[in-house]
């Protein structure tokens, strides 16, 4: 739940940096381990690249960085840094990304 306010975002644009962790969208995790969306809005074990792609489809700039999620520190994971306008809340961003992530997961299931 870390967000930093900076003048420069991931690609040099202005806005607010929002940190998104794949655990926010993982339907296999309980909320106490970091899931931030309802189970039916999540996907099982989302990949950081898919979360970043979902953020881009939702209209945000996104960059994947190496880091470990504090609640699951023993797992080496990556985080997604999203550049967001000041007037958009983190909750709204998470919901928008979750919606796009479900579409990506559904398309992947259809291809398999």
From Swiss-Prot:
The keyword RNA-binding applies. One of its GO terms (molecular function) is 7S RNA binding. One of its GO terms (cellular component) is signal recognition particle. One of its GO terms (biological process) is SRP-dependent cotranslational protein targeting to membrane. Gene3D superfamilies: Signal recognition particle, SRP19-like subunit. It is found in: Cytoplasm. Keywords: Cytoplasm, Ribonucleoprotein, RNA-binding, Signal recognition particle. Pfam families: SRP19. Disulfide bonds: none annotated. Belongs to the SRP19 family. Involved in targeting and insertion of nascent membrane proteins into the cytoplasmic membrane. Binds directly to 7S RNA and mediates binding of the 54 kDa subunit of the SRP. Part of the signal recognition particle protein translocation system, which is composed of SRP and FtsY. Archaeal SRP consists of a 7S RNA molecule of 300 nucleotides and two protein subunits: SRP54 and SRP19. This is Signal recognition particle 19 kDa protein.
């Amino acid at each position: 739940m870390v967000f930093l306010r900076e003048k420069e975002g991931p690609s040099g644009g202005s806005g607010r940096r929002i940190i998104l962790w794949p655990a926010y969208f993982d339907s296999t995790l309980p909320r106490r381990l970091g899931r931030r969306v309802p189970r039916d809005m999540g996907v099982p074990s989302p990949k950081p690249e898919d979360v970043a792609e979902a953020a881009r489809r939702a209209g945000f700039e996104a960059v994947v960085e190496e880091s470990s999620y504090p609640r699951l520190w023993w797992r080496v994971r990556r985080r997604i840094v999203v550049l967001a306008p000041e007037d958009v809340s983190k909750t709204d961003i998470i919901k928008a990304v979750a919606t796009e992530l479900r579409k990506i997961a559904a398309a992947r299931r259809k291809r398999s």
